[in-house]
Swiss-Prot record:
This is Methionyl-tRNA formyltransferase. Keywords: Protein biosynthesis, Transferase. CDD domains: FMT_core_Met-tRNA-FMT_N, Met_tRNA_FMT_C. PANTHER family: METHIONYL-TRNA FORMYLTRANSFERASE, METHIONYL-TRNA FORMYLTRANSFERASE, MITOCHONDRIAL. Its EC number is 2.1.2.9. The keyword Transferase applies. The gene is fmt. It comes from Shigella sonnei (strain Ss046). GO terms for molecular function: methionyl-tRNA formyltransferase activity.
Length: 315
Protein backbone atom coordinates (compact mmCIF):
# COMPACT_ATOMS: atom_id res chain seq x y z
CA UNK A 1 0.00 0.00 0.00
CA UNK A 2 1.32 3.45 -0.93
CA UNK A 3 -0.10 4.79 2.36
CA UNK A 4 2.74 2.98 4.14
CA UNK A 5 5.46 4.80 2.17
CA UNK A 6 7.45 7.33 4.18
CA UNK A 7 7.05 10.50 2.11
CA UNK A 8 8.93 13.80 2.25
CA UNK A 9 7.00 16.61 0.57
CA UNK A 10 8.83 19.61 -0.90
CA UNK A 11 6.86 22.54 -2.30
CA UNK A 12 6.10 26.21 -1.78
CA UNK A 13 3.08 27.92 -3.48
CA UNK A 14 -0.64 27.20 -3.42
CA UNK A 15 -0.27 24.78 -6.36
CA UNK A 16 2.01 22.65 -4.16
CA UNK A 17 -0.20 23.01 -1.08
CA UNK A 18 -3.11 21.47 -3.00
CA UNK A 19 -0.97 18.39 -3.67
CA UNK A 20 0.09 18.12 -0.02
CA UNK A 21 -3.53 18.43 1.05
CA UNK A 22 -4.52 15.60 -1.31
CA UNK A 23 -1.76 13.36 0.07
CA UNK A 24 -2.87 13.96 3.64
CA UNK A 25 -6.58 13.58 2.81
CA UNK A 26 -5.90 10.19 1.24
CA UNK A 27 -4.05 8.90 4.28
CA UNK A 28 -0.45 9.05 3.07
CA UNK A 29 2.38 9.09 5.60
CA UNK A 30 4.13 12.45 5.17
CA UNK A 31 7.10 12.43 7.55
CA UNK A 32 8.44 15.90 6.79
CA UNK A 33 7.80 18.99 4.69
CA UNK A 34 10.40 21.18 3.00
CA UNK A 35 9.41 24.64 1.81
CA UNK A 36 11.16 27.90 1.02
CA UNK A 37 12.02 30.34 3.83
CA UNK A 38 9.39 32.91 4.82
CA UNK A 39 9.48 35.92 2.49
CA UNK A 40 8.58 39.61 2.96
CA UNK A 41 5.19 40.31 1.37
CA UNK A 42 2.51 43.00 1.26
CA UNK A 43 2.88 46.71 1.85
CA UNK A 44 4.41 46.23 5.28
CA UNK A 45 6.95 43.72 3.92
CA UNK A 46 6.10 41.44 6.82
CA UNK A 47 7.62 37.96 6.69
CA UNK A 48 4.99 35.58 5.35
CA UNK A 49 5.03 31.77 5.39
CA UNK A 50 4.42 29.84 2.19
CA UNK A 51 1.01 28.19 1.63
CA UNK A 52 2.73 24.81 2.07
CA UNK A 53 4.15 25.84 5.45
CA UNK A 54 0.77 27.11 6.63
CA UNK A 55 -0.91 23.80 5.74
CA UNK A 56 1.90 21.66 7.16
CA UNK A 57 1.82 23.48 10.49
CA UNK A 58 -1.99 23.21 10.63
CA UNK A 59 -1.56 19.44 10.26
CA UNK A 60 1.26 19.24 12.82
CA UNK A 61 3.92 18.13 10.35
CA UNK A 62 7.64 18.84 10.82
CA UNK A 63 8.63 21.78 8.58
CA UNK A 64 12.13 22.48 7.26
CA UNK A 65 13.09 25.72 5.47
CA UNK A 66 16.71 25.58 4.34
CA UNK A 67 17.91 28.39 2.07
CA UNK A 68 19.69 25.75 -0.02
CA UNK A 69 19.98 21.97 -0.13
CA UNK A 70 23.65 22.12 -1.08
CA UNK A 71 25.15 22.37 2.45
CA UNK A 72 25.80 19.11 4.27
CA UNK A 73 23.61 20.14 7.21
CA UNK A 74 20.62 20.72 4.89
CA UNK A 75 21.14 17.34 3.23
CA UNK A 76 21.33 15.69 6.64
CA UNK A 77 17.79 16.95 7.37
CA UNK A 78 16.60 14.90 4.39
CA UNK A 79 18.69 11.85 5.28
CA UNK A 80 17.48 11.78 8.89
CA UNK A 81 13.85 11.36 7.78
CA UNK A 82 14.67 8.01 6.12
CA UNK A 83 12.04 8.52 3.44
CA UNK A 84 10.99 6.01 0.81
CA UNK A 85 10.23 8.80 -1.68
CA UNK A 86 10.41 12.58 -1.91
CA UNK A 87 7.57 14.36 -3.71
CA UNK A 88 8.59 17.71 -5.22
CA UNK A 89 5.97 20.21 -6.45
CA UNK A 90 7.03 23.78 -7.33
CA UNK A 91 9.60 23.79 -4.53
CA UNK A 92 11.88 26.40 -6.07
CA UNK A 93 15.20 24.97 -4.86
CA UNK A 94 17.61 22.76 -6.81
CA UNK A 95 17.96 19.23 -5.47
CA UNK A 96 21.61 18.11 -5.67
CA UNK A 97 22.41 14.58 -6.85
CA UNK A 98 23.09 13.47 -3.27
CA UNK A 99 19.55 14.47 -2.23
CA UNK A 100 17.96 12.88 -5.31
CA UNK A 101 19.53 9.57 -4.34
CA UNK A 102 18.64 9.61 -0.63
CA UNK A 103 15.06 8.23 -0.69
CA UNK A 104 14.79 4.51 -1.49
CA UNK A 105 12.53 5.20 -4.50
CA UNK A 106 14.16 8.50 -5.40
CA UNK A 107 12.44 11.85 -5.91
CA UNK A 108 9.39 12.44 -8.09
CA UNK A 109 8.12 15.74 -9.46
CA UNK A 110 4.72 17.01 -10.62
CA UNK A 111 5.29 19.15 -13.73
CA UNK A 112 2.59 21.32 -15.32
CA UNK A 113 2.90 20.15 -18.92
CA UNK A 114 2.87 17.03 -21.07
CA UNK A 115 6.61 16.41 -21.15
CA UNK A 116 8.86 16.57 -23.07
CA UNK A 117 6.95 19.65 -24.28
CA UNK A 118 7.53 22.70 -22.10
CA UNK A 119 10.34 21.77 -19.79
CA UNK A 120 11.25 24.67 -17.55
CA UNK A 121 9.83 27.49 -15.48
CA UNK A 122 6.58 28.58 -17.15
CA UNK A 123 4.89 25.55 -18.76
CA UNK A 124 1.30 26.63 -18.12
CA UNK A 125 1.80 30.08 -19.63
CA UNK A 126 3.79 28.83 -22.61
CA UNK A 127 1.19 26.24 -23.60
CA UNK A 128 -1.35 29.06 -23.94
CA UNK A 129 1.13 31.43 -25.56
CA UNK A 130 1.89 28.83 -28.26
CA UNK A 131 -1.75 28.01 -28.97
CA UNK A 132 -1.53 24.37 -27.83
CA UNK A 133 -4.79 22.43 -28.02
CA UNK A 134 -4.11 20.55 -24.80
CA UNK A 135 -1.81 20.40 -21.82
CA UNK A 136 -1.69 18.40 -18.61
CA UNK A 137 0.59 17.15 -15.87
CA UNK A 138 3.49 14.74 -15.94
CA UNK A 139 4.72 12.88 -12.88
CA UNK A 140 8.39 12.16 -13.46
CA UNK A 141 11.36 10.58 -11.75
CA UNK A 142 13.78 13.40 -11.02
CA UNK A 143 17.38 13.43 -12.18
CA UNK A 144 20.01 16.18 -12.20
CA UNK A 145 18.73 17.72 -15.46
CA UNK A 146 15.98 20.32 -15.91
CA UNK A 147 12.77 18.28 -16.20
CA UNK A 148 14.67 15.54 -18.05
CA UNK A 149 13.77 12.51 -15.92
CA UNK A 150 11.78 9.46 -16.96
CA UNK A 151 8.02 9.99 -17.12
CA UNK A 152 5.93 7.86 -14.75
CA UNK A 153 2.37 9.06 -15.36
CA UNK A 154 0.50 11.66 -17.44
CA UNK A 155 -2.95 13.22 -17.36
CA UNK A 156 -4.13 15.64 -20.05
CA UNK A 157 -6.80 18.31 -20.36
CA UNK A 158 -7.98 20.46 -23.29
CA UNK A 159 -7.13 24.15 -23.49
CA UNK A 160 -10.24 26.17 -24.32
CA UNK A 161 -10.46 29.49 -26.15
CA UNK A 162 -11.43 31.12 -22.84
CA UNK A 163 -8.63 29.70 -20.70
CA UNK A 164 -6.14 32.00 -19.00
CA UNK A 165 -3.08 30.89 -17.08
CA UNK A 166 -5.19 31.35 -13.96
CA UNK A 167 -7.95 28.96 -15.07
CA UNK A 168 -5.45 26.46 -16.47
CA UNK A 169 -3.51 26.57 -13.21
CA UNK A 170 -6.69 25.58 -11.37
CA UNK A 171 -7.37 22.71 -13.79
CA UNK A 172 -3.85 21.33 -13.39
CA UNK A 173 -4.04 21.76 -9.61
CA UNK A 174 -6.97 19.30 -9.77
CA UNK A 175 -5.25 16.88 -12.15
CA UNK A 176 -1.85 16.85 -10.45
CA UNK A 177 -2.93 15.29 -7.15
CA UNK A 178 -4.84 12.54 -9.02
CA UNK A 179 -1.73 11.66 -11.00
CA UNK A 180 0.50 11.87 -7.95
CA UNK A 181 -1.59 9.50 -5.85
CA UNK A 182 -1.80 6.98 -8.71
CA UNK A 183 1.97 7.18 -9.23
CA UNK A 184 2.73 6.62 -5.54
CA UNK A 185 0.57 3.50 -5.58
CA UNK A 186 2.41 2.20 -8.65
CA UNK A 187 5.81 2.92 -7.10
CA UNK A 188 4.81 1.15 -3.90
CA UNK A 189 3.55 -2.00 -5.60
CA UNK A 190 6.25 -2.08 -8.29
CA UNK A 191 3.97 -1.50 -11.29
CA UNK A 192 5.33 1.91 -12.38
CA UNK A 193 6.54 1.94 -16.00
CA UNK A 194 9.13 4.70 -16.50
CA UNK A 195 9.20 6.13 -20.02
CA UNK A 196 12.26 7.91 -21.39
CA UNK A 197 11.56 11.39 -22.80
CA UNK A 198 11.95 11.79 -26.56
CA UNK A 199 14.64 14.46 -26.93
CA UNK A 200 13.43 15.31 -30.46
CA UNK A 201 10.13 16.61 -29.01
CA UNK A 202 11.61 18.87 -26.32
CA UNK A 203 10.55 22.51 -26.02
CA UNK A 204 11.53 24.93 -23.26
CA UNK A 205 9.16 27.14 -21.28
CA UNK A 206 11.23 30.23 -20.62
CA UNK A 207 10.42 32.45 -17.66
CA UNK A 208 8.05 35.33 -18.25
CA UNK A 209 9.06 38.96 -17.86
CA UNK A 210 7.11 42.19 -17.58
CA UNK A 211 8.90 43.48 -20.67
CA UNK A 212 7.80 40.49 -22.74
CA UNK A 213 4.22 41.21 -21.68
CA UNK A 214 4.32 44.66 -23.30
CA UNK A 215 2.04 44.44 -26.34
CA UNK A 216 3.99 44.36 -29.61
CA UNK A 217 1.53 45.48 -32.27
CA UNK A 218 3.67 43.98 -35.06
CA UNK A 219 2.58 40.51 -33.91
CA UNK A 220 -0.65 38.99 -35.22
CA UNK A 221 -3.96 39.63 -33.49
CA UNK A 222 -4.27 35.89 -32.79
CA UNK A 223 -0.85 35.77 -31.10
CA UNK A 224 -1.56 38.88 -29.05
CA UNK A 225 -4.91 37.51 -27.87
CA UNK A 226 -3.14 34.32 -26.74
CA UNK A 227 -0.48 36.41 -24.96
CA UNK A 228 -3.19 38.32 -23.09
CA UNK A 229 -4.62 35.05 -21.78
CA UNK A 230 -1.19 33.49 -21.15
CA UNK A 231 0.06 36.46 -19.12
CA UNK A 232 -3.12 36.65 -16.99
CA UNK A 233 -2.87 36.89 -13.96
CA UNK A 234 0.91 37.62 -14.18
CA UNK A 235 2.70 39.59 -15.51
CA UNK A 236 -0.36 40.92 -17.43
CA UNK A 237 -0.18 42.20 -20.99
CA UNK A 238 0.12 45.97 -21.06
CA UNK A 239 0.45 49.00 -23.29
CA UNK A 240 1.63 52.50 -22.52
CA UNK A 241 -0.49 55.63 -22.93
CA UNK A 242 0.83 59.06 -21.95
CA UNK A 243 3.61 57.40 -19.98
CA UNK A 244 1.19 55.25 -17.99
CA UNK A 245 0.99 51.45 -18.15
CA UNK A 246 -2.49 50.15 -18.98
CA UNK A 247 -3.08 46.43 -18.41
CA UNK A 248 -5.20 44.45 -20.85
CA UNK A 249 -7.36 41.75 -19.27
CA UNK A 250 -9.35 40.57 -22.23
CA UNK A 251 -9.43 40.95 -26.00
CA UNK A 252 -10.82 39.24 -29.07
CA UNK A 253 -9.65 38.77 -32.65
CA UNK A 254 -11.44 40.37 -35.60
CA UNK A 255 -10.49 38.52 -38.78
CA UNK A 256 -10.61 41.51 -41.07
CA UNK A 257 -7.65 42.63 -43.17
CA UNK A 258 -6.44 46.19 -42.72
CA UNK A 259 -3.76 48.27 -44.39
CA UNK A 260 -3.35 50.45 -41.31
CA UNK A 261 0.03 50.45 -39.59
CA UNK A 262 0.27 48.12 -36.55
CA UNK A 263 -0.89 49.94 -33.42
CA UNK A 264 -3.33 52.22 -35.25
CA UNK A 265 -6.66 52.69 -33.48
CA UNK A 266 -9.40 51.90 -36.01
CA UNK A 267 -12.56 52.19 -33.91
CA UNK A 268 -13.40 52.92 -30.28
CA UNK A 269 -16.99 52.17 -29.34
CA UNK A 270 -19.16 50.06 -27.04
CA UNK A 271 -18.02 46.92 -28.89
CA UNK A 272 -14.41 47.60 -27.85
CA UNK A 273 -11.26 49.37 -28.95
CA UNK A 274 -10.15 47.97 -32.30
CA UNK A 275 -6.44 48.19 -33.07
CA UNK A 276 -4.53 47.17 -36.20
CA UNK A 277 -1.83 44.54 -35.70
CA UNK A 278 0.75 42.84 -37.91
CA UNK A 279 -2.04 40.53 -39.07
CA UNK A 280 -5.70 41.21 -38.30
CA UNK A 281 -7.42 43.43 -35.76
CA UNK A 282 -7.28 43.10 -31.97
CA UNK A 283 -10.42 44.21 -30.14
CA UNK A 284 -9.60 45.34 -26.59
CA UNK A 285 -12.49 44.47 -24.26
CA UNK A 286 -11.27 44.92 -20.67
CA UNK A 287 -8.48 47.23 -19.51
CA UNK A 288 -6.98 48.51 -16.26
CA UNK A 289 -5.28 51.92 -16.06
CA UNK A 290 -2.62 52.38 -13.38
CA UNK A 291 -4.16 52.76 -9.93
CA UNK A 292 -7.65 51.75 -11.10
CA UNK A 293 -9.70 48.56 -11.20
CA UNK A 294 -10.18 46.59 -14.41
CA UNK A 295 -13.06 47.97 -16.47
CA UNK A 296 -14.81 47.43 -19.77
CA UNK A 297 -13.56 49.29 -22.83
CA UNK A 298 -16.85 51.23 -22.80
CA UNK A 299 -16.30 52.41 -19.22
CA UNK A 300 -12.74 53.44 -19.99
CA UNK A 301 -13.87 55.35 -23.07
CA UNK A 302 -16.39 57.23 -20.93
CA UNK A 303 -13.55 58.68 -18.86
CA UNK A 304 -10.58 58.58 -21.23
CA UNK A 305 -11.90 58.81 -24.78
CA UNK A 306 -8.99 61.10 -25.71
CA UNK A 307 -6.65 58.12 -25.28
CA UNK A 308 -8.31 56.19 -28.09
CA UNK A 309 -8.95 58.57 -30.98
CA UNK A 310 -9.28 56.60 -34.25
CA UNK A 311 -6.25 57.20 -36.44
CA UNK A 312 -3.88 57.62 -33.50
CA UNK A 313 -1.21 54.97 -32.96
CA UNK A 314 -0.54 53.14 -29.72
CA UNK A 315 3.14 52.72 -28.87
Amino acid sequence: MSESLRIIFAGTPDFAARHLDALLSSGHNVVGVFTQPDRPAGRGKKLMPSPVKVLAEEKGLPVFQPVSLRPQESQQLVADLQADVMVVVAYGLILPKAVLEMPRLGCINVHGSLLPRWRGAAPIQRSLWAGDAETGVTIMQMDVGLDTGDMLYKLSCPITAEDTSGTLYDKLAELGPQGLITTLKQLADGTAKPEVQDETLVTYAEKLSKEEARIDWSLSAAQLERCIRAFNPWPMSWLEIEGQPVKVWKASVIDTATNAAPGTILEANKQGIQVATGDGILNLLSLQPAGKKAMSAQDLLNSRREWFVPGNRLA
